[in-house]
Structures are given as C-alpha cells and as structure tokens.
Amino acid sequence: MADQQNVEAITDHSNGSAIASPRSSTDSRSPSTRSQSLRLSHSNHQHRQSFSDSLRAAPGSPRARRQPSLTQAAIQSLIDNPPAPRDVNPAFAGRDWREITIGELVSPDDLKFVEVDTGIEEATNMLIDTNAPVLLIRETPQQKTVVGTFDYSDLNAYLLLAAGLTQPTEELRAPYEQLARKAREGHKIPLQDVKALGRNEPLTTLPASASLMAAVETFGGGVHRVIVVDERKDGEVVGIFSQFRLVKFLWENGRSFPVIDQLYPQYLRDLGIGSREVVSINGDKRLCEVLQLMNSEGISSVAVVDNHANVVGNISTTDVKLLTRSSSLPLLHNSCIHFISVILSARGLVEGKDSFPVFYVNPGSTLAHTVAKLVATKSHRLWVTDPLSPSSSGPPTPSHSSGQLPLAANPIQSPPLSPPPTSAGIPSPNYTTPHLPSPPVGIPHVVAPSIPASALPGARLSGRLVGVVSLTDILNLHARASGLRPADPAENRSRRRRSSSSSVSVRKSGDIGRELFSRRE
C-alpha cells in the first residue's frame, strides 16, 4: 500500500540490537525531489527571517534622545551654592541674628561632668562612651561651676606621656615623679595630676544672655569653645557653645541674616580667608610622629600627604580613641597611611559609613560650598588644594611642611611653624586594661604592610596642598563683615603652641615612662 509505512532497521552497534524506526511515505520520494523541496523551504525561511528582522530593528535608546535635566552650568551653580537645610527653626525666623542670645542655642544635655579626683581611666572611658567632645571638670559633684576641661587633645598628650614619647620640663619633673610613684603604688591617677602636666589653656566663659555677636567676635579670635554660665546663679554652667555649633546655626538660618548670607556666593580667593601656613605630614611617617606634631603645635588635626604634597587623608586628635586598647599598640609605629585605613574601617564598622571622607576645597570654591562641606563632615577645618597642579611637580614632601595659598591681598597670617619634634629611645608600652596604659614589656614594633605614599593616587583624590581654611577663619570673616574687631587668631595659635611646648618636651629616654605606669590591673 502507498500509505503503508516502511520500517527501516537500524542496527545499534553498542548492543547489537535492531530498533525499528518509522518513516513516512513522503520520505520515500526521490532524493532530487526532496532536495528541491528543502531548498525552496530554506529560501522562504531566509526571506521571512530577513523581512522579520527588518521590521524588528532594535529601537534607539531613549537616553540618546533625552535631554539632560541639568546643564553643566546648572550643576556647577549647585555645587557653588548648595541649598541650606529647609528645616529652619521657626523660633529664629525673621529675627535679627545679632539679638539672639547664646543661651537659646545651648542645652544642659550637652554637659558631661567629672571631678578633679576622677581617675584618668574613668574619664577616658566617659569621653569615648558618651561621644562628648569635652568633659567639664569640677571640684565636687555638688558644685555647679567648673575649673577645667578634658578633651581629646588632653587624651593625646596623656597617651604620649604614658607611652614614653614625651617628658616634662625641669619645672614639672617633681610632680611627674610624684605621679610615677602613685602609679607604682597602685593608686588611682586623678585628672588634676594629669592636667598639671599638660596644656593649661584658660577657660573662656560667656553669660547666657550674651548675643551671637559676642560669640562671633570671641570665636573669630581663635577661641574654639566657651563655657556658657548663668550670671544670675553665681556662674552656674548651663551649656557649652562651640565654633562648629555657631557656624552650623548661621548656615542653616543664613537666609534670615542678610549680612552673612551675602558672603556665601563669593569665592575663597576673593574673600581672602584661609591660612598660608599649613602643617602636614608624609603618609609614610610613623603615627607617633603625627601625634607628637599635633601636641607640640597645639592643633587638632593634620593633613596627610603623598610624596608630591597631594592630600590623601586627615588625622585628628579625636582619632586617638582608636589607640586606647591593647591591640592598638603596634599602630603607634605603623605609618600614617595605615592608620587612615584603620580610621575608615572603624567608621564603616561602627557608623556604617564606607565612603572616603572629603576634607578639601580649592581657592575657587565658594564660601557656601566650603561651609556646607564643613557642616556635612563635622570638621573644624578643610585643606585647600590646587587640583590643576600635576602630581609630579615639586620634590618629595617632608614630614613637616607649609604651602602657599594664592588668596587675595592681606590674608590672615599665621606665625612661622616651629620645628617638628623628634624622638629617641621610644619604649613600647603595653595596655592591659581598656583605656589605661601600663608598664612596657618589650613588645616588638610590628609594622603592617601598607601602600607607600609614593604609590598613592593623591592627584586624582584631591590635589596639591596649598593651604587650610578653618572655622576660625570663617567666623573671623563674619565678625569683620559685621563691623566687629576680633582678635588676631594667630595670637591664640601661638599661645597654644607655647603652652604645649612649655608643658612637655620630647623624651630622650624611657626611664620615667617605665615608672609612670608600672602597676598592672
């Protein structure tokens, strides 16, 4: 039968069996007929495919036709003039800022007290755990007045002393040895004894009824914080007012203060603010050297640069809280670059911030851009860089250098820099309890591998360091624009430097350091 299926035997060579495979009657046509049919079918398929492809050509990307929402000029304008926060306190809307009192801007919740006989370990724990910028020292828990402060600059000076990196001058040797005797006998080391060996800056107080004008003039002269007291209650402390809080307040409410608001769109180079002298350290230098530098110069932060003076990071006195654990001992002898990686790692683990902090502006930045960045990063100063300078220009940067900031005439001058401290015979202390150094036990200096300063992409990160602009510079500008006559900030800088250098000097031997913290807990 024509319709009957033929069966083709296919031999399975693997097992020798025969498998029947059905084949339709159409397959029984002659080979030439089948070949012609297949060619026609294939030709029709190709025709259909090409026609289909022509109809289904990939459409153009909408992004190619979409116009940018902001022009380059608009983006630059937004960078130069960032919008201030909209959540302005209605209590200050429409008011003359010169009539607002500092008592309205402080809170008793900011006050953290310790007593003169509080132990150094307890005070350090409190400073770190409460995240307070400063502790107020009083005579007794019942007193409402203060006799001193304890902050991270004091903690830095104390750690240098405990690690044997500094020693007192001759006039302070007797109280220093008395402190060492207390340590040997296992007694608590009170704050008043430690403060006697450190920097002794006078307390600056202002009444709560003082206007912001008084605060601007005081801060513009280089004072970093004031103790706010209630003159009606025998000088009872009611708050702490700082440079940062004032700058933040004026920025957030600037639209209500025309005298200040008109300054924000202007460029740093035109305003003539900033310091031509800037302290920096090469990233390959040891961490202990930058701690000594901050202590001897009386400053709270130092720019870290690569071999061509490009800014690659920032180390401040606040970062010393990462050095109060026993596991932190080797960091003192590791490089500054390595410590910056530790800072960023700790910030990511504790605060969930994994971005690289931005601590620089350039002479072409507006005051608004500068202040917005200061407020956003909670910084006290920003490094001024020249982003157009080639990374290969200039010789390798020494550990202590200064740059020239191309600002307008008559910029704020800073005094010449004092020579950097040197050290010899540095002992290796051991920290047996969370925040208290104890006797050295000869731990070797373990240097962790880190990227050398010569290999850092500093030119792409920032630019060549040429100056610094601080909260003091900005408030000094506000004071002068308001018709005030603030003191020269250079005088306060010199006073802090003299206070630091007269209190401690660089160690030449580790003998006293070994005696100071000879007890174990």
Curated annotation (Swiss-Prot):
GO molecular function: protein serine/threonine phosphatase inhibitor activity
Domain of life assignment: Eukaryota
Keywords: CBS domain, Cytoplasm, Nucleus, Repeat
Gene3D superfamilies in the cross-refs: CBS-domain
Domain CBS per the UniProt entry, residue ranges: 106-171, 199-256, 274-331, 335-391
Keyword Nucleus: yes
Sequence ranges of Pro residues compositional bias: 413-422
Main location per the UniProt record: cytoplasm
Coiled-coil ranges from the UniProt annotation: none
Region ranges (Disordered): 1-70, 386-437, 484-521
Any GO BP: regulation of mitotic metaphase/anaphase transition
Biased composition (Polar residues): 1-18
UniProt xrefs under InterPro entries: AMPK_gamma/SDS23_families, CBS_dom, CBS_dom_sf, Ssd23
Biased composition (Basic and acidic residues): 508-521
Low complexity composition bias: residue spans: 21-41
Listed GO CC annotations: cytoplasm; nucleus
Entry similarity comment: Belongs to the SDS23 family.
Protein task: Involved in DNA replication and cell separation.
Official protein name in the record: Protein sds23
Organism in which the protein naturally occurs: Aspergillus clavatus (strain ATCC 1007 / CBS 513.65 / DSM 816 / NCTC 3887 / NRRL 1 / QM 1276 / 107)
Encoding gene (name): sds23
